[in-house]
C-alpha cells in the first residue's frame, strides 16, 4: 500500500506490475538522456559564438534528427506493446471472479462456486478498529489464492466505475452493459488496497477495494466456511 510522502510506486505484487516498473525505469532513462542532450545544446548555444549562420543545407544533420527519434520511439514502443499483450493474455484461469460496481460499493461473485457472492462496503470512520485505515477498510474482503492465474470479469450496474489495484498494476473500467476482463496473479500473500478510479458520483471516494491474497489451502477453507454460512 501507499505511505505518506511516498514518491515511487507501491511494491509490485504481480508479474505485470514488475514489468511495468521495469518499463517505467527504461522510459525514464531515455527521457533523462534526451533532456540532458537538449539542455547541453541550449547551454552551448547560449555560451558560445554562433557559427555557420548562413547554412542553407545540412543533409547529414536532417538525416540524423529524422532517424534518431524514430529509433527512440521504437525502443519505447516495443516493451510497451509486450506488456499490453501480457495484460490481455488469459490462459487457462484457475478461478473466475465477477465484479460489479454500484453507487457506491462493489459486489463479487465467485463463478466457479454454486452460491458464493457478497457485497463489499466501506467501513465508516466511526466504526473503525485501532490500526485500521480510514476510507480504505471494507466489511468483506475479496479473498483469492496466491500464485494462480485468476480472471476478473468487471462491469457496472449503474454508472461508470473503475476497479483499480496499484500494487497489482491493474486498472479496469466497469462500464454498464459491457464486460471487461483482466488477469490477477499474486506472487505473495497479504492485504492489498485500491479504490474506484473513475468519478462516479458524490460518494466516489467511498468505494475502497481490499484484496486478501492467501495460500490455496486457506482459500479452500474460507470458501467452505462462506458457503456453509450462506
Swiss-Prot record:
One of its GO terms (molecular function) is cytochrome-c oxidase activity. It comes from Ornithorhynchus anatinus (Duckbill platypus). InterPro entries: CcO_II, CcO_II-like_C, CcO_II_C, Copper_CuA, Cupredoxin, Cyt_c_oxidase_su2, Cyt_c_oxidase_su2_TM_dom, Cyt_c_oxidase_su2_TM_sf. Residues 1-14, 88-230 are mitochondrial intermembrane. The chain crosses the membrane at residues 15-45, 60-87. Its cofactor is Cu cation. Its EC number is 7.1.1.9. Belongs to the cytochrome c oxidase subunit 2 family. Pfam families: COX2, COX2_TM. One of its GO terms (biological process) is ATP synthesis coupled electron transport. It comes from the Eukaryota. It is an enzyme of class 7 (translocase). The keyword Secreted does not apply. It catalyses: 4 Fe(II)-[cytochrome c] + O2 + 8 H(+)(in) = 4 Fe(III)-[cytochrome c] + 2 H2O + 4 H(+)(out). Component of the cytochrome c oxidase, the last enzyme in the mitochondrial electron transport chain which drives oxidative phosphorylation. The respiratory chain contains 3 multisubunit complexes succinate dehydrogenase (complex II, CII), ubiquinol-cytochrome c oxidoreductase (cytochrome b-c1 complex, complex III, CIII) and cytochrome c oxidase (complex IV, CIV), that cooperate to transfer electrons derived from NADH and succinate to molecular oxygen, creating an electrochemical gradient over the inner membrane that drives transmembrane transport and the ATP synthase. Binds a dinuclear copper A center per subunit. Cu cation A1 binds at residues 161, 196, 200, 207. This is Cytochrome c oxidase subunit 2. Cu cation A2 binds at residues 196, 198, 200, 204. Gene3D superfamilies: 1.10.287.90, Cupredoxins - blue copper proteins (2.60.40.420). Component of the cytochrome c oxidase (complex IV, CIV), a multisubunit enzyme composed of 14 subunits. The complex is composed of a catalytic core of 3 subunits MT-CO1, MT-CO2 and MT-CO3, encoded in the mitochondrial DNA, and 11 supernumerary subunits COX4I, COX5A, COX5B, COX6A, COX6B, COX6C, COX7A, COX7B, COX7C, COX8 and NDUFA4, which are encoded in the nuclear genome.
Amino acid at each position: 500500500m501507499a505511505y505518506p510522502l511516498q514518491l515511487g510506486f507501491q511494491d509490485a505484487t504481480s508479474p505485470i506490475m514488475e514489468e511495468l516498473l521495469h518499463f517505467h525505469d527504461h522510459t525514464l532513462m531515455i527521457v533523462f538522456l534526451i533532456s540532458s542532450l537538449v539542455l547541453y545544446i541550449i547551454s552551448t548555444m547560449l555560451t558560445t559564438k554562433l557559427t555557420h549562420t548562413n547554412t542553407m543545407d545540412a543533409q547529414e544533420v536532417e538525416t540524423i534528427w529524422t532517424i534518431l527519434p524514430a529509433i527512440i520511439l521504437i525502443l519505447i514502443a516495443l516493451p510497451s506493446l509486450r506488456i499490453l499483450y501480457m495484460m490481455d493474455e488469459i490462459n487457462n484461469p484457475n478461478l473466475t471472479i465477477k465484479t460489479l460496481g454500484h453507487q457506491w460499493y462493489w459486489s463479487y461473485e465467485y463463478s466457479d462456486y454454486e452460491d458464493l457472492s457478497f457485497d463489499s462496503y466501506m467501513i465508516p470512520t466511526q466504526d473503525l478498529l485501532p490500526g485500521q485505515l480510514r476510507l480504505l477498510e471494507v466489511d468483506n474482503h475479496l479473498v483469492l489464492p496466491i500464485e494462480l492465474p485468476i480472471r476478473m470479469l468487471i462491469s457496472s450496474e449503474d454508472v461508470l466505475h473503475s476497479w483499480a489495484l496499484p500494487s497489482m498494476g491493474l486498472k479496469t473500467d466497469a462500464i454498464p452493459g459491457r464486460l471487461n476482463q483482466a488477469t490477477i496473479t499474486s506472487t505473495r500473500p497479504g492485504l492489498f488496497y485500491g479504490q474506484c478510479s473513475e468519478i462516479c458520483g458524490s460518494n466516489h471516494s467511498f468505494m475502497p477495494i481490499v484484496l486478501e491474497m492467501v495460500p490455496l489451502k486457506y482459500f479452500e477453507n474460507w470458501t467452505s466456511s462462506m458457503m456453509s454460512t450462506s
